[in-house]
């Protein structure tokens, strides 16, 4: 999607809402309209409300950290019955605008217990503690996010609240089964060090006992310094890590530079042929769903470190 450089989102949202009201328009249909900032959230919504009309803001390969909404996004948010966003500063460019949507928005990460979240090295504008927003890589936290989505759907559409609750329970059972399968696959992986292109896998590391390092930090536009790359190359060579995992958002130049730095230290490290899925899902099945992407990531790591 193209980036917009027009009026601020909050102003445009207010303007389009006033226009709709003044014209007496009613854009609602029998199906709920759900706007989701990420594919992970859109997939959760589809599992809980399969009849809903769902719009995904950031598609495959996009970066929700830096994404700026288009006019089409603004219209879709205005028309939606429910706007789902990750929160925890993932959608860093549009936090105020999303919060301005009032009761019809839900930041799923903000519903979680801070004690379960991993700290983030950066601070907020007011100096407040930030937390790692990549919660979908923790099956436990993502199940809690699914639960909160089910509750919100029940609030919006109380007639079908029991259906949403049942669907959430069923989906959470599938997530738990995927975690069990991943634990078995990853049990013998060695060394327990995961080198990725994008800094999105810390919850994966916490869940499955991996030490996580990334060539990019926070966003696809924020690369590590030469000193940090050198230190990471030392770690890879010292621990004899056999593979660097590229992902669908990584900076390939950073991955190549790291590989060369490792080889200069006398250790040969390969770059995985199979990419991991970081902030977005894949364009095709099976990685176009949360479960598909999660299982793919676990299997790819297990195979490469077997």
Predicted regions and their residues:
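Bacterial Sec-type N-terminal signal peptides, specifically the leucine/valine-rich hydrophobic h-region
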Residues: 15-18
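Extracytoplasmic metal-acquisition and chelation regions
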Residues: 3-9, 20-306
């Amino acid at each position: 999607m193209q980036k917009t450089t027009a009026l601020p989102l909050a102003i445009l949202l207010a303007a389009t809402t006033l226009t709709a009201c003044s014209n007496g328009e009613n854009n609602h249909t029998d199906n709920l309209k759900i706007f989701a900032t990420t594919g992970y959230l859109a997939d959760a919504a589809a599992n809980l409300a399969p009849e809903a009309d769902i719009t995904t803001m950031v598609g495959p390969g996009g970066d929700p950290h830096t994404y700026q909404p288009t006019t089409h996004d603004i219209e879709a948010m205005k028309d939606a019955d429910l706007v789902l966003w990750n929160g925890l500063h993932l959608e860093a460019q549009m936090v105020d605008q999303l919060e301005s949507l009032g009761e019809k928005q839900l930041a799923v990460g903000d519903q979680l217990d801070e004690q379960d979240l991993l700290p983030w090295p950066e601070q907020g504008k007011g100096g407040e503690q930030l937390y790692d927003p990549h919660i979908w890589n923790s099956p436990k936290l993502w199940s809690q996010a699914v639960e909160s989505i089910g509750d919100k759907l029940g609030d919006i559409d109380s007639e079908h609240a029991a259906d949403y609750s049942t669907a959430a329970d069923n989906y959470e059972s599938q997530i738990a089964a995927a975690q069990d399968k991943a634990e078995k696959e990853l049990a013998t992986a060695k060394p327990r060090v995961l080198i990725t292109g994008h800094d999105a896998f810390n919850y994966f590391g916490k869940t499955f006992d991996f030490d996580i390092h990334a060539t990019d930090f926070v966003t696809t536009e924020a690369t590590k310094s030469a000193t940090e790359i050198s230190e990471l190359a030392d770690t890879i060579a010292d621990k004899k890590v056999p593979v660097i995992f590229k992902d669908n958002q990584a900076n390939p130049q950073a991955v190549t530079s790291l590989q060369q730095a490792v080889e200069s230290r006398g250790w040969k490290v390969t770059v995985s042929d199979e990419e991991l899925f970081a902030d977005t899902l894949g364009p095709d099945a099976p990685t176009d769903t949360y479960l598909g992407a999660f299982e793919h990531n676990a299997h790819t790591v297990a195979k490469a470190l077997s």
